[in-house]
Amino acid sequence: MANFYPDFLNMQPPPNYVAGLGRGATGFTTRSDLGPAQELPSQESIKAAIEQRKSEIEEEEDIDPRYQDPDNEVALFATAPYDHEDEEADKIYQSVEEHLSKRRKSQREKQEQLQKEKYEKENPKVSSQFADLKRGLSTLTDEDWNNIPEPGDLTRKKRTKQPRRERFYATSDFVLASARNENQAISNFAVDTQAGTETPDMNGTKTNFVEIGAARDKVLGIKLAQASSNLTSPSTIDPKGYLTSLNSMVPKNANDLGDIRKARKLLQSVIETNPKHASGWVAAARLEEVANKLSQAQSLILKGCENCSRSEDVWLEAIRLHPAAEAKVIIANAVKKLPKSVTLWLEAEKLENQAQHKKRIIKKALEFNPTSVSLWKEAVNLEEEVDNARILLARAVELIPMSIDLWLALARLETYENAKKVLNKARQTIRTSHEVWIAAARLEEQQGNVSRVEKIMARGVSELQATGGMLQRDQWLSEAEKCETEGAVITAQAIINTCLGVGLDEEDQFDTWLDDAQSFIARKCIDCARAVFAFSLRVYPKSEKLWLRAVELEKLYGTTESVCSILEKAVESCPKAEILWLLYAKERKNVNDIAGARNILGRAFEYNSNSEEIWLAAVRIEFVNNENERARKLLARARIESGTERIWTKSISLERILDEKDRALQLLENALKIYPHYDKLYMMKGQIFEDKEQIELARDAYLAGTKVCPYSIPLWLLLAKLEEKQSVIRARVVFDRAKVKNPKNEFLWLELIKMELRAGNISQVRAALAKALQECPSSGLLWTEAIWLEPRAQRKTRATDALRKCEGNAHLLCTIARMLWLEKKADKARSWFLKAVKADQDNGDVWCWFYKYSLEAGNEDQQKEVLTSFETADPHHGYFWPSITKDIKNSRKTPQELLHLAINVL
């Protein structure tokens, strides 16, 4: 019975039929089924809009875009004729732009460098972060590298598939037999289809023509490869570059035999295909030398000499590879083939041991090369007699008149009069040579004619400008530096006086000259720096900055007389500069010339009658020399004529030192009427009452001061210390009031922490320190206290955190140095102490610790160096140092005595 399949798929559906509706699969309608919500524009309106847009675009294209921007003037006159005046104007504008770009170039480059370093420091590269780890990789051996495990695939998906990929099964014998039979059938089929490919031999063996064809193809490929090197058509391989690459293939040692064989074949191919190429022979010989086959290397290089007899390199290589006896024979053949080669003649001279033979070779060389400067110099050097050398040089300058070295050498061997003639002749021959003029100036300096040196240099510069041989300014300064290093100081100064202002604008020359002097000082050319300052001061005699720099230079590298000499000139040029008078008086006082110091300050009063510093300097001189009455009279006069706050405080301090407390209090009352808001007056008043053990009056003085001067930190600290003697609780109240008036102040927090430490409140100390570091994260004093509060094992970590917060703080750097010192790392400690004093030379605390370290861990030279640097720096600030210097008991002590006192108290 046949099955019936309904053919409804090919039938027409009934009306209103919706597929799937019977099973509830209803469809949905989108906006695209309904059509657009708005009516589309008509074809006419679309065409009209397109035409209108085309007309707008054409109008926009008619307007040149460069006329749209009123600030853009590019090509406004492009259609105008370009004549000579326009070209000259463009050159002028170009020169102006170049000049503007050169101005402040060094400052601009320095600023850009600082910004770059700051950016690199804030955004370090990954390579720089791991630089120290990379250096450690150099210690790994090849075995360590080979033992590094391969990275595994740790993804979950591939980790599950990995065992399946690495699962192996043994192949069945049936598969192997089938594969063997299949290969045999294919080979039989290939043999049968080629009629006559195998011919039986007379002895019954068969000839395999398939193998013969494969061998023939291999031989043909080798021949084609060899023939390709002889092609005359253009090639993409550069022959010189190819030989260079062959040289680079020479192995560094004889261990890699495979590379040696490969390089030997390549180089053999090179010298066979192109036997006239010298580099191939040299490379082949060096390869054999590296392979420890010296005889083969010698044989190869001799063949190279036969094939490339016009090549210097091949002959020089042959000389190098052979012993001295054989090398002499080779060099003899070489100079016969290349008699014009100066290098070969000089090499022949080196092979000789006796001076007579050397001279003979050089003379023979000069017959073929009479214009070789190197040969003439060698001939002169070989002569032991000055007269013979002079004769040779005279002949040399006749043959080579443009060699300035030969002229100068001849002038050095002549007498003074003859040397002048030689230099004049050299000047006439080589009119663009500056060396001749410098040599003439040095000749006059050697004869003691100092006045003629600068005249010669001035004339030389003018003639060089006329003949086009004028050097750049920097080149002249280099010549001056060279003269100083060779002992010609007067000539160096003459060069600077003549050429320092060459090519400089008036507005740039001041800063440029300061930079020149600083660069000379950095290179230890002190006389050149002196000459720069002397020239600059002639141009700017009223510049206080220049005089101070010159005085500083003399204090470092000159004598007391030279310092006083330049200070005398300075005060004559700048009589209103207080600092110059003070330095001058101090220099005289340092050499115990008290009368001279008084005389200098007396002269200073004539120009600076109201100068506070000069008054106080005069008082200091009298006080140090125990002239107390004269000091009182000077201060009384100063209070009338100047009457500044410092003069009043010095007057009160003098009375305190002399133990005249009542007179000091009387002066204080008078001073407070004039300066009621000067905090030091209240501090001194409280201290006087403390000395008199009148605690209540001292407290009243401090309280009155804090009301009038609430932002004076030392005043609050004195009040807190006074209250601490009575009660720690009252001192805390003082600190709280002070912190309200002066938030985020490191000194208040530090004294509070130290007070709690003295009271033994460790928990309070740690809480206060944590809050202090939150308010003052860049305080070196607070970080120092935090480091010393940590156990010894954790101090290094704490110091690392501190360096991130306040790098460059002198207190912190000194603390790190002390830590290293405690760990017996003396050299590292010294380097950190040097960093600390460099960060802040006015910090007396750092100098105290540095000197104490030098006394215990340094040698005598280091101690003297620290002491000298301390006296030069003359520090006045710090946390601990002012308590030593401002103590009235130490008022008459010298800085060295104060330093020794401080390190004993530390």
Swiss-Prot record:
The keyword Amino-acid biosynthesis does not apply. Keywords: mRNA processing, mRNA splicing, Nucleus, Phosphoprotein, Repeat. Residues 108-124 have a biased composition (Basic and acidic residues). Residues 50-129, 142-164 are annotated as: Disordered. The keyword Metal-binding does not apply. The modification Phosphoserine is found at S235. HAT repeats lie at residues 258-290, 322-353, 354-384, 385-416, 524-556, 558-590, 592-624, 693-725, 726-758, 760-792, 824-856. PANTHER family: PRE-MRNA SPLICING FACTOR (PTHR11246), PRE-MRNA-PROCESSING FACTOR 6 (PTHR11246:SF1). Involved in pre-mRNA splicing. Interacts with prp6 and prp13. May also be involved in the regulation of the G0-G1/G2 transition. Required for pre-spliceosome formation, which is the first step of pre-mRNA splicing. This protein is associated with snRNP U5. Has a role in branch site-3' splice site selection. Associates with the branch site-3' splice 3'-exon region. This is Pre-mRNA-splicing factor prp1. It comes from Schizosaccharomyces pombe (strain 972 / ATCC 24843). The lineage of its organism: Eukaryota, Fungi, Dikarya, Ascomycota, Taphrinomycotina.
